Swiss-Prot record:
It catalyses: (2R)-3-phosphoglycerate + ATP = (2R)-3-phospho-glyceroyl phosphate + ADP. It is found in: Cytoplasm. The gene is pgk. One of its GO terms (molecular function) is ADP binding. The modification Phosphoserine is found at S183. Pathway: Carbohydrate degradation; glycolysis; pyruvate from D-glyceraldehyde 3-phosphate: step 2/5. This is Phosphoglycerate kinase. PROSITE patterns: PGLYCERATE_KINASE. Gene3D superfamilies: Phosphoglycerate kinase, N-terminal domain.
Amino acid sequence: MNKKTIRDVDVRGKRVFCRVDFNVPMEQGAITDDTRIRAALPTIRYLIEHGAKVILASHLGRPKGKVVEELRLDAVAKRLGELLERPVAKTNEAVGDEVKAAVDRLNEGDVLLLENVRFYPGEEKNDPELAKAFAELADLYVNDAFGAAHRAHASTEGIAHYLPAVAGFLMEKELEVLGKALSNPDRPFTAIIGGAKVKDKIGVIDNLLEKVDNLIIGGGLAYTFVKALGHDVGKSLLEEDKIELAKSFMEKAKEKGVRFYMPVDVVVADRFANDANTKVVPIDAIPADWSALDIGPKTRELYRDVIRESKLVVWNGPMGVFEMDAFAHGTKAIAEALAEALDTYSVIGGGDSAAAVEKFGLADKMDHISTGGGASLEFMEGKQLPGVVALEDK
């Protein structure tokens, strides 16, 4: 990684504006999963231990530039304080006189959490005035919010124009793991691409076909490829306007010598419900009024064998409608295969894949779970992430 990190700068006595990703799931004002808060702890602890005055900023949800009471960060400040075992002060604004006064009161090793930065319309517009106001609070900017690195917002990109800007440890790990996967992978290198829509994964499939040895396709997007092979897909998800593209991807795989794996059998249902009637059918025998909602047992075995023989696997997107237990077997089989394959380095690309390994209790068996769904997707598309570009080079 060629970006400076907090190790490369002296933080003692400095006011450090640290952008974190505390966008945690909430229900009735309570945090239901604190993974993202825990993920930022190494950076926050390092700053505390090295005598920084720590100013934390994050978004929560999508308030669209207005104050939304249930999206305030009070519950986050409380949970962070419990995890750090020290008080975390919190302001009701993210800029302004109240915030300046709170920053002035900070001693070395103190932690202050600003209010939800997306309460300000200027945040998502990357308004230079808001970015300047953030910058005026601090001497140094640290970005540890990989999950928001694909956004050019005031607190992720704009602020870096006005302060020295470096990466935190979480950002560093994400860039190192994903960067190595794309630039210098251990082989055989396998990508597993699932999820509902081809259109969301076009860039990823296109970029990965240049790099992988094996490409495994699953989830709703697989049926556009199945249709491209000339098979009927019944009422399964289908993007008619992407059939030609699917054909071209299969052609490209052949040209590049990439082994392209698709489902050989599927679990079909007569309606979209957990208690629907289901059966397993070969891929070329999906009944007209049924939908394929998961990969079948033969496909699970096939994919498991490919995983077992891989040195590196990047997984982005589930194999079926894993939220319904009846159609979770395919996704679970992938997670289990990765957990069991000890010689295989597993990178889970955030979003639904991360939620799936959590659901099956296998998160601790994965080598790297990305904290950014959209960010890891754009990184794997080969795009430059604005929040990363803005950081200082070593």
